[in-house]
C-alpha cells in the first residue's frame, strides 16, 4: 500500500482513506472468490526513511487499526497475511519474533503471518526455525533466492524449508516471487538495476518458472 493507505498514520483521514481503500478491494475479492491477501498491509511501502520512524507509536496505531480492518475483511470471508519485511523495506517488524508479537496483539483469527525467504535471508538466523515458530499462525509464504531469482538457482536450503513446512502441517499457498528484469515501477521499487535473466525471452521465463515449480514440488512434497 502507498502512503495514502497507511494504517499506522497519525492522520485519521489517512487511516479512514485506507479502510475505504481496502473495503473496496475486499468487495471485489469476494466477487472473484479470492479469500486471502498479504503484504505490508499494516503500514505503507516503500517506506520514506528520510524521516525518523516512530516505531512505538506506529505499532500502536497499526494494531488498533488492523483490528478494524480485520473485522471488515471477516465480513467478506478474507484472511489478512502480514508480511515480515527486511529492515530496508519496513520497520514495524523485521523478523518472526516481532511479527508474531504483532499478530498476537491484533488477536483476530483472520490475521496471519506471511514469511518470505528473501526477507528471511537478511533478517533471520535460520530458515527453518521461523517456520516452526510461526506454526499455526503461518498463512502464506513467498519463495525466492537471495538475489530474487526463482527457487533452485541459488543457495537457500529448500529441502529443509519443505521439511519444516510439513512438520507444522502447512497447507497454505506457496508463491514464487522472482524479480529478474529491469524496468517499470516494480523494477524501480524493488531496485532491480541489472538484467538477472541473462536476456531471457517471455518463453524462457515461462520455462524457468515451470522448472522452479517442479523443483519446489520435489523439495516440499518429499
Where are these regions (language model features)?
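Short, flexible segments with low predicted structural confidence
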Residues: 1, 44-45, 71-75, 137, ...
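Active-site-proximal loop/turn and secondary-structure-junction residues that shape catalytic pockets
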Residues: 2-3, 41-45, 84-88, 117-119, ...
Amino acid at each position: 500500500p502507498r502512503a495514502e493507505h497507511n494504517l499506522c498514520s497519525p492522520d485519521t483521514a489517512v487511516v479512514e482513506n485506507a479502510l475505504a481503500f481496502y473495503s473496496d478491494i475486499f468487495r471485489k475479492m469476494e466477487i472473484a472468490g479470492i479469500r486471502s491477501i498479504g503484504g505490508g498491509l499494516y503500514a505503507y511501502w516503500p517506506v520514506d526513511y528520510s524521516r525518523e520512524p516512530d516505531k512505538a507509536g506506529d505499532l500502536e496505531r497499526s494494531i488498533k487499526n488492523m483490528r478494524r480492518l480485520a473485522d471488515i475483511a471477516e465480513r467478506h470471508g478474507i484472511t489478512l497475511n502480514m508480511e515480515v519485511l527486511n529492515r530496508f523495506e519496513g520497520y514495524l517488524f523485521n523478523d518472526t519474533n516481532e511479527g508474531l508479537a504483532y499478530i498476537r496483539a491484533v488477536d483476530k483469527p483472520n490475521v496471519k503471518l506471511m514469511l518470505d525467504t528473501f526477507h528471511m535471508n537478511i533478517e533471520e538466523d535460520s530458515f527453518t526455525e521461523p517456520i516452526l515458530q510461526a506454526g499455526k499462525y503461518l498463512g502464506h509464504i513467498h519463495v525466492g533466492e537471495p538475489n530474487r531469482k526463482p527457487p533452485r538457482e541459488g543457495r537457500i536450503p529448500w529441502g529443509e524449508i519443505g521439511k519444516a513446512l510439513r512438520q507444522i502441517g502447512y497447507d497454505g499457498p506457496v508463491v514464487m516471487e522472482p524479480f529478474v528484469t529491469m524496468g517499470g515501477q516494480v523494477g524501480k521499487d524493488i531496485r532491480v538495476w541489472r538484467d538477472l535473466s541473462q536476456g531471457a525471452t517471455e518463453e524462457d521465463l515461462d520455462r524457468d518458472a515451470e522448472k522452479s515449480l517442479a523443483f519446489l514440488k520435489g523439495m516440499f512434497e518429499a
